[in-house]
Every structure is written in C-alpha cells, then in structure tokens.
Amino acid sequence: MVKIGVLGLQGAVREHVKSVEASGAEAVVVKRIEQLEEIDGLILPGGESTTMRRLIDKYAFMEPLRTFAKSGKPMFGTCAGMILLAKTLIGYEEAHIGAMDITVERNAFGRQKDSFEAALSIEGVGEDFVGVFIRAPYVVEVADNVEVLSKHGDRMVAVRQNQFLAASFHPELTDDHRVTAYFVEMVKEAKMKKVV
C-alpha cells in the first residue's frame, strides 16, 4: 500500500486524510521534515496561501519541499497548494516551491463570498465532478509539457505536469474521491517505476 503525506501545517488536512484513506492508500499527516522521507507522495492542501507560506518558513519546510519535488515523488496541490507549486504567480516576484511550469493568479474567482460549486469534466477522472471553489486561484498560462485536465468556462482549473498535479478547487470537500484516487494511482505508478 502506498503512503501519502498531507502537509499538516494549515488547511483542509483532515478532509484530505479521509479522502486518501477512502482511495485505498495510507495517509500520514506531515508535521516534521523527516516525515517526508517516509512517504511515496505528498498533498499540499488548500488553505490560506500567505499563512501557509509563513508556517512553511517558520518550520523551515521550504527547502525540504523543493528537494521532495526534485525526487520524482508525486505532489498534488489543491487551491493554495496549486499556488505553492506554480513557477510564476501574477503580481509576485518569486515562486514558492516552483515545481510546475504554470502561471497562476491568486483569488482569481473573487473573495470568500464569491465561493461556488461547479460541475467539471476532468480528463482521466470523469464527468460531473463537483468542484468546490473557495477564493480559488486559476491557471493563466501553461508550458507545452503541461496537460490541462479541466477548465471552468475558459479558465484552467486542473493541470498535470509529469508527477505534479494541481487543482484550483477542493476535491477533498466532497464525498467524491475520484480526483484523490487519480493522484493515488499516480503515486502507485511512480513507486512501481522506482522498483523496476
């Protein structure tokens, strides 16, 4: 069974743990740097990206997260997690982890009161997935090697680049675990490649 970490500094941690377990993987709440060595994949949960960055810096997680990104193990960022994975952020000079060749705009769908749900078609996942958008970012631009998995209107809201997956919405806030299951499969495939 693969072991998937959920970065436990802030955000929808419990919900991700539940979704990972429902998808047939072991979930670990990552609160210490050394735990990164024990896991096969990592979820960066939604939350407040500025607060999350402050906590990442406070607990000296940034370099270990960048090292994890370079290790070939899959990472999945939802909402604020997408912001952490992006190489370019509109209105900001520097990236956070910067592992994905995507340009992201923060709070692109408006503030908390503008939160909404929308039925999405997601490549590799299926139709009618309810995307929960809460002060969500969206992907403005992608490099050629980034696969766009879903759009809401003309806005890119789910993307994949090799072992990295990112979504504007919160898949963990529904009882539909298909997006998490997709990530679990990515982790299983990556682990199999390592073994071979």
From Swiss-Prot:
Pfam families: SNO
Gene Ontology CC annotation, any one: glutaminase complex
NCBIfam families on file: PLP_synth_Pdx2
Domain of life: Bacteria
Pathway of action: Cofactor biosynthesis; pyridoxal 5'-phosphate biosynthesis
Protein name stated in the entry: Pyridoxal 5'-phosphate synthase subunit PdxT
Record GO terms (molecular function): glutaminase activity; pyridoxal 5'-phosphate synthase (glutamine hydrolysing) activity
